């Protein structure tokens, strides 16, 4: 998620940047291995040779994150295949970069002294998790993070699982876990397979067909919006939403203007000189954004979409500050950690 736009919001809305310093973000794929096989995985589905290599020397990682801190990075987005499988790399980042978010499937608990926010992905209820991901890991993830203030559970909605939202919300409620929503966004590979132009076997395309299509077709985005609002009214202490953002991200038309290659020209998550995406072998990714396998036409994941929303804040003068507060609630440091960061910022100024 491009910090150029997040940082502007931090300065203008709520004063977070004033208290803890400038937010400068970058994305790091710290792992190229995973213990699940999610249908249409945004990391592996259609990936190139870059996912086949990884830097395994922890001293190299430690020096790398030190150099990133010296470059001015203050907020790390840690992802890849499954970052919790490389806890030493998480720690190496945490020792140098003060804030961050880890995107994980929750099957391996991240140690409690790592004070980054932890976003745990869910793809459906107990019954369907194995279909979507190759294993039913919901309960394990929820037990790992029960009552953990760092954790935010993220249900990826698709055209097939909207009726499962109440089950997931109830399970999160029972485990003291907040729930937010993302929208399934097909990779270029997924779209090619659904159109019949790619046929080779893939661990990340197992059950999808014309009768089992996870993509949001006509009117399905409106159904997703209504399902989110209905669930939020039923589980107000568990579900966290920004109504303005939900209304925007579920609008029927594409969120983006595309160039002749099908690449979004008005995406708030494009890589820049400062906002960089590194692969697991520590090479600098030269693609369009931190999720280059996604088809820009249908791109609606929550983190990337929030960056784009902030980049268009002049188009939403009455709403963007509330959306920024939503970002801060789910991505920003916890109140007790924010105070420590504020004290640290004062000591270095």
Explain the meaning of each model-derived region:
Residues 28, 32-35, 261, 290-293:
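Processing junctions and N-termini across compartments
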Residues 70-74, 94-100, 108-117, 146-151, ...:
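Short glycine/proline-enriched coil/turn segments at helix->beta-strand junctions
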Residues 1-112:
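Conserved alpha-helical substructure of the radical SAM core
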Residues 48-63, 80-140, 155-167, 183-193:
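Canonical radical SAM enzyme core domain
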Residues 2, 8-17, 22, 267-349:
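Flexible mid-to-C-terminal extensions adjoining Fe-S/redox cofactors in radical SAM and related proteins
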Residues 121, 127-261, 265-266, 278-281:
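Radical SAM enzyme [4Fe-4S]-AdoMet core and its adjacent flexible, acidic
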